[in-house]
């Protein structure tokens, strides 16, 4: 087995695993976890888990929300090719409406970690809430801008969900999902009032619920 050295996968400005008190010199692996799609009115919430390979650096990692779509798409392919392992998971619209968005997000995170081919000995999660996991975990606020593995997870989750929204647009072009990605923009809210909700809309979210009530006979 090849020896592990301190991680070189972080982009300039991101702290190394050793600076975070984590080291490849001890047995085990570090996974980063992040989500995409908590705020939209439609579609699943997506989570990703990534274990990076310190001998295959990925340059340019950062918060997916501040990267251009072109850069995210390029990094998506590079992360999938170079990571030791990764997993993208979802919680459905039905699960969101049944559990609430927070619990559905934590469920998607659990599924992403459980789907990793390798078992991490620690999981770092973006934000301030942790899913229940079988391994030690730590929540890191703004972790997608601080930790390379979380940044990689945020990119995988964001790109995957954006692609789902393109598919939703093909099925329901009247809502404009390709543009707003399900977020409550004025155009999306106007389309909801005109066309009502489709099967991809989250009925538990107030703007959708209000439209459904308005359209009751």
UniProtKB/Swiss-Prot annotation:
Its EC number is 3.1.26.4. It comes from the Bacteria. CDD domains: RNase_HII_bacteria_HII_like. It holds the Pfam family RNase_HII. Gene3D superfamilies: Ribonuclease H-like superfamily/Ribonuclease H (3.30.420.10). Its cofactor is Mn(2+); Mg(2+). It catalyses: Endonucleolytic cleavage to 5'-phosphomonoester. It is found in: Cytoplasm. One of its GO terms (biological process) is DNA replication, removal of RNA primer. Its main location: cytoplasm. A divalent metal cation binds at residues 34-35, 126. One of its GO terms (molecular function) is RNA binding. GO terms for cellular component: cytoplasm; ribonuclease H2 complex. Keywords: Cytoplasm, Endonuclease, Hydrolase, Manganese, Metal-binding, Nuclease. Residues 28-217 form the RNase H type-2 domain. Manganese or magnesium. Binds 1 divalent metal ion per monomer in the absence of substrate. May bind a second metal ion after substrate binding. InterPro entries: RNase_HII, RNase_HII/HIII, RNase_HII/HIII_dom, RNaseH-like_sf, RNaseH_sf. Belongs to the RNase HII family. Endonuclease that specifically degrades the RNA of RNA-DNA hybrids. This is Ribonuclease HII 2. It comes from Methylibium petroleiphilum (strain ATCC BAA-1232 / LMG 22953 / PM1). The lineage of its organism: Bacteria, Pseudomonadati, Pseudomonadota, Betaproteobacteria, Burkholderiales.
